[in-house]
Curated annotation (Swiss-Prot):
Residues 22-34 have a biased composition (Polar residues). The lineage of its organism: Eukaryota, Metazoa, Chordata, Craniata, Vertebrata. Residues 48-103 form the bHLH domain. Transcriptional repressor. Downstream effector of Notch signaling which regulates cell fate choice in angioblasts. Represses the venous cell fate, thereby promoting the arterial cell fate and aorta formation. This is Hairy/enhancer-of-split related with YRPW motif protein 2. One of its GO terms (biological process) is blood vessel development. One of its GO terms (cellular component) is nucleus. It comes from Danio rerio. The keyword Membrane does not apply. SMART domains: HLH, ORANGE. Belongs to the HEY family. The keyword Nucleus applies. It is found in: Nucleus. Keywords: Developmental protein, DNA-binding, Notch signaling pathway, Nucleus, Repressor, Transcription, Transcription regulation. Residues 294-311 have a biased composition (Low complexity).
């Protein structure tokens, strides 16, 4: 009974010695497996590092692709070719380099101007539409290049494109000339000089509220002739007894007239008599006298004046300002 037990124990001892021998023989692999299995923090750090590296790489690729798409949209030659075929990244970069070289050669004139850039994109779009029309005629309609209808249509559209480009160049030149001389438009935005206001009888206060409240009393008489075409005839007197809304409109009209007169005087320095530059003293005195008489006469006289003014031809105030 004891021998089988001894045999079993000897077999187990043999197995144990074999296992120990195998561990000694493959100590490197066992130690490596023990380190990998025994340090979960190291494994998690490696996985987190790999994950972060993948996220960084994805962001870098997205940034490169977005920049290439922006270059394809901004460069005119790439924008012209993007509708017909898919551009490669190398082609987009090459077109960008060529475009920058051209800008450096020409000094960058006209490409940083919004008007010129818009006209450039407009001509490019027209050329792209011309290409699409030719492709449609050949693929859908079945018209070859020698067909007279296609030849006439394509030649007509090509001539239109050439004319549009020539007109765009002329417009861009005129636009640059206007940009170089902005004082024609900025003169109307400057405040009215005090000396000019004193000569014309307008108040020289700097506050806008005082100018708007006092302008109808002194300046409305100077422009009663031009404002009569704009105001509808009322049942009461003409100038002083208008409703409050008409008074505010009249003050704004007087201010606009004074600003336009100042702009015209600065733009076209003509020699006028003393007083208001655009009117002679006789016209000013007659207009003031007519406004004073119209404020003191009865309703019948007012109706006669309104009928007399209605019989006059329509003269908008824009024509009087534009005449100078």
């Amino acid at each position: 009974m004891k021998r089988p037990c001894e045999d079993s124990t000897s077999d187990s001892d043999m197995d144990e010695t074999i296992d120990v021998g195998s561990e000694n023989n493959y100590s490197g692999q066992s130690n490596g497996s023990f380190i990998r299995c025994g340090s979960p923090t190291t494994t998690s750090q490696v996985m987190a590092r790999k994950k972060r590296r993948g996220i960084i790489e994805k962001r870098r690729r997205d940034r490169i692709n977005n920049s290439l798409s922006e270059l394809r949209r901004l460069v005119p030659t790439a924008f012209e070719k993007q509708g017909s075929a898919k551009l490669e990244k190398a082609e987009i970069l090459q077109m960008t380099v060529d475009h920058l070289k051209m800008l450096q050669a020409t000094g960058g004139k006209g490409y940083f101007d919004a008007h010129s850039l818009a006209m450039d994109f407009l001509s490019i779009g027209f050329r792209e539409c011309l290409t699409e029309v030719a492709r449609y005629l050949s693929s859908v309609e079945g018209l070859d290049s020698s067909d007279p209808l296609r030849v006439r249509l394509v030649s007509h559209l090509s001539s239109c494109a050439s004319q549009r480009e020539a007109a765009a160049m002329t417009t861009s030149i005129a636009h640059h000339q206007q940009a170089l001389h902005p004082h024609h438009w900025a003169a109307a935005l400057h405040p009215i000089p005090a000396a000019f206001l004193q000569q014309s009888g307008l108040p020289s206060s700097e506050s806008s509220s005082g100018r708007l409240s006092e302008a109808p009393q002194r300046g409305a008489a100077l422009f009663s002739h031009s404002d009569s075409a704009l105001r509808a005839p009322s049942t009461g007197s003409v100038a002083p007894c208008v409703p409050p809304l008409s008074t505010s409109l009249l003050s704004l009209s007087a201010t606009v007239h004074a600003a336009a007169a100042a702009a015209a005087a600065q733009t076209f320095p003509l020699s006028f008599p003393a007083g208001f530059p655009l009117f002679s003293p006789s016209v000013t005195a007659s207009s003031v006298a007519s406004s004073t008489v119209s404020s003191s006469v009865s309703t019948s006289t007012t109706s006669q004046q309104s009928s007399g003014s209605s019989s006059k031809p329509y003269r908008p105030w824009g024509t009087e300002v534009g005449a100078f």
